[in-house]
């Protein structure tokens, strides 16, 4: 259901419903937001309606406004139960059904943002042809095992105002007589139909040219769908020039052979073993890397200590050499120091001789280029300000880009639709298998029951003939009748047990539905609204009493 909620939110934002970016699901809709969005949709469907745009603060006005919205939804064709409680004390399932119906009724030009005359590239044209082929395959396909309710559940528009005659979300009796799995299967089918109907309304998806006509009726989705060359080309394009996928029929035939299944199992086991070995090797590699880093750090510490010891050794060796003949060595050092001092004085005089003209030249250049330096300083300040402005603009654009990136692309919707179709096919196969097993079991039960009844009749007739003359036959007849009675009671108990289990499952389904209705939250909200109405009633009574008192005083005067 998250995908449907995303599509609903995207469609509401396309018609300028002013939804916050923090809204990520229908469960976050407050009554005020719900009233505003539903009113916007109804005004787009029928501009002649006079509907309020906001929810007033008073409880009496709230009941009036929500009741008017419920009547407007019924007037445009909504067939399910709807009233003020749908807006004030709603649950996600009811809100989703209402929005699905309203979005289906929206005029086409209110949600289609793509230019129908825009040129199509080669890939878009290929996708359009694929979607046309899928639509033709899905139209008019019926399966003998499909319930008649589902065969006749169509989505159509009547009249010139693009209103649904009986939309698929309003069929209240479609799931009558079916179990929990049938209802889930039907729910998945309706989700897929809703995906196909809403795909062309996405402004950034490019489905405007895909050919999903809203005025064309769509039959129940069923049966096998063949894979044509266009689908293979599209898959190859999205796989970035990878190897072409073989035909779906060859894959199914190859998958059904026992040898190929055995080979696949062996390959999967080998892959699992290789993955285990790879993970073990990676773990060992990480351990060795950690050990290598530890050893390298230790070696580096030892090398640094060795370097320090070498320096100390050199100093001590020189000191030892000097201490062997101290007077001569001290005289040599003093002569070296005196020579170094003389050399330093000579270099200082040479430096002063070169420094004076250089300083004069530097001062001359500074005086000459002071204006250029000041201009460069001002320009650098302007560049810094411009950089700050552009950095803020870049941050804002990055936020907008991230917000725009939440929109799901056309490829994601296409793959999701194909995935839902595959799930429907799989669920249909499971349901057909269950129905076949149930019918086979029922036939077997009926056959065995008939055989037992016939055998009892024959045995009863044979024993009853001899019961008058033979005492043992009489006792056998009594035991036979008792056995037949007890077996009948056991059969009745088994049937009652099945009935009780079925009722238990139905009650569990009802409990799940009640949990989805947010009964506790709605009761708390109703209690708050009741207290608010009581406070308003007391304020009105006090105002009436004050008016009566003022009127009585004026009368006495």
Curated annotation (Swiss-Prot):
UniProt keyword list: Coiled coil
Coiled coil keyword on record: yes
GO biological process annotation, one example: positive regulation of ubiquitin-dependent protein catabolic process
GO molecular function terms listed in the Swiss-Prot or TrEMBL record: cullin family protein binding
Coiled coil regions, renumbered to chain: 260-350, 489-554
Taxonomic superkingdom: Eukaryota
UniProt entry tagged with the keyword Chloroplast: no
Assigned protein family: Belongs to the CCDC22 family.
Annotated protein name in UniProt: Coiled-coil domain-containing protein 22 homolog
Annotated organism of origin: Anopheles gambiae (African malaria mosquito)
Lineage, highest ranks first: Eukaryota, Metazoa, Ecdysozoa, Arthropoda, Hexapoda
